[in-house]
From Swiss-Prot:
UniProt source species: Aeromonas salmonicida (strain A449)
Record bears the keyword ATP-binding: no
Entries under InterPro entries matching the protein: ArAA_b-elim_lyase/Thr_aldolase, Beta-eliminating_lyase, PyrdxlP-dep_Trfase, PyrdxlP-dep_Trfase_major, PyrdxlP-dep_Trfase_small, TNase
Molecular function GO labels: tryptophanase activity
Entry similarity comment: Belongs to the beta-eliminating lyase family.
This protein's name: Tryptophanase
Length: 461
């Protein structure tokens, strides 16, 4: 079959520059062996995150020029609200500056409404900031991911699913009154950008509602999840992405969204409620205090204009096929070279199994982070660790939590890089593989108490 190229023309370019090996080592040492602390100008191909790093369309840039910067009642908010109601069916819409802004104003209110004395949040897998906001609210985050996701070589289609048996047992053991919310993360980032099946979402929603537990959808990559449902579930093969999205969101009571992913914008988030006017109003109070007035939530009007357009563009099936195909292509290149990855590839990134590639480095020396550093030194490619460093310590004991995965995430920004860039990344990682046994683990030089992977400084063991 003829290969289909990117479904867009490029109207603007940004120069990037290569660096020497000596320059990269100096930059990494200055950054405390933490790719997060590298200067962007020292990075050749940046696969740190897909959050806010994508390219906007000409229509979005046109929307930027039509920004209404009224403090209250901006017409851009009205358009965003109309778009959310149409696409997701949620009546009460609150913009936030990004996803974590939505979490910080919602989670404390869910805790306040929890009838039990020991509230917990249960998810297929909380991402780092989600877990942090649960802990900042004084509560515990419990991950109940399907065990099928733990075998990175198994070609299971729905590695983002909940373990339904454990979910049932956990609710019964802890008591439904102690569950502040069940959070369905779509797609499941920490498991490898893996999708959650519609059947699993339906079962989780039914179980939660039977116990009167709120269902929150962490919707950062909702469109990619919908694409996988269409591609992998025969029952939805003839459904449109829009129809699948609407059915997914029918299963939640509220959603938080970092719109910097599938919203195709550089900044923005959403905190939305299907009904729940009383909860919505309580969260509004926090929004005013922490994010900004309820019709802008920390965003400029022009950013809301771009988001209203981006939500629709992000659901375009042709775009999604290209997007997920680009991820799959990089995964195929690596797998063909014998580099272990989470299979099948997910929606936004290729996840390299550092535990298998670097078996000589124990979890407490952060093998995936060590691999990220080695990849940067090889070719100026910046990736990020999803493993023990990100997971952190048990807040009760202070001991390092045991990570299910030690993964290097190669996160592909939307509409930014071409296949040639992917080939370069693959070539660099293949070169790293040839000297994998020489890579050393890392230990802390400075360890922050929370979300340590962002600002920690490390050194080779």
């Amino acid at each position: 079959m003829r290969r289909i190229p990117e479904p867009f023309r490029i109207k603007m370019v940004e120069p990037i520059k290569q660096t020497t090996g000596a320059e990269r080592r100096a930059a990494l040492e200055a950054a405390g062996w933490n790719p997060f602390l590298l200067l962007a100008e020292d990075v050749y191909i940046d696969l740190l995150t897909d959050s806010g790093t994508g390219a906007m369309s000409d229509r979005q840039w046109a929307g930027i020029m039509m920004g209404d910067e009224a403090y209250a009642g901006s017409r851009n908010f009205v358009e965003l609200e109309r778009t959310v109601r149409e696409l997701f069916g949620y009546q009460h819409v609150m913009p936030t500056h990004q996803g974590r802004g939505a979490e910080q104003i919602l989670f404390p209110e869910l805790v306040k409404r929890c009838k039990g004395k020991a509230p917990v949040f249960i998810s297929n897998y909380h991402f780092d900031t989600t877990k942090a906001h649960v802990e900042l609210a004084g509560e515990r985050a419990i991950n109940l991911l399907t065990p099928k996701a733990l075998d990175t070589t198994a070609p299971y289609a729905w590695k983002g699913d909940f373990d339904l048996g454990r979910l049932t047992d956990t609710i019964e053991t802890l008591g439904a009154d102690n569950v502040a919310a069940v959070i369905i993360t779509v797609t499941c980032n920490s498991a490898g950008g893996q999708p959650v099946s519609m059947g699993n979402m339906q079962a989780v929603s039914e179980l939660a509602r039977r116990h009167h537990i709120p269902v929150v959808i962490d919707a950062a990559r909702f469109a990619e999840n919908a694409w996988f449902i269409k591609a992998r579930d025969p029952d939805y093969a003839k459904s449109s992405i829009k129809e699948i999205v609407r059915q997914m969101f029918d299963l939640g009571d509220m959603f938080t969204m970092s719109a910097k992913k599938d919203g195709l914008v550089n900044i923005g988030g959403l905190c939305c409620f299907k009904e729940g006017l009383d909860l919505f109003r309580s969260v509004q109070v926090r929004c005013v205090a922490m994010e900004g007035f309820v019709t802008y939530g920390g965003l400029a009007g022009r950013d809301m204009a771009a988001l209203a357009i981006g939500l629709r563009e992000g659901m375009d099936e042709e775009y999604l096929t290209y997007r997920i195909g680009q991820v799959a292509y990089l995964g195929e290149r690596l797998a063909e070279a014998g580099i272990p990855i989470q299979t099948p590839t997910g929606g936004h990134a290729v996840f390299v199994d550092a535990k298998k590639l670097l078996p000589h480095i124990p979890g407490e020396q952060f093998p995936a982070h060590a691999l990220a550093c080695a990849l940067y030194l090889e070719g100026g490619v910046r990736g990020v660790e999803i493993g023990s460093l990100l997971l952190g310590r048990d807040p009760a004991t202070g001991k390092q939590e045991a990570a299910d995965f030690e993964l290097l995430r190669l996160t592909i920004p939307r509409r930014v890089y071409t296949r040639d860039h992917m080939d370069y990344v693959a070539d660099c990682l293949i070169a790293v593989k040839t000297r994998a046994s020489e890579i050393r683990g890392l230990t802390f030089d400075y360890e922050p108490p929370l979300l340590r992977h962002f600002t920690a400084r490390l050194k080779p063991v």
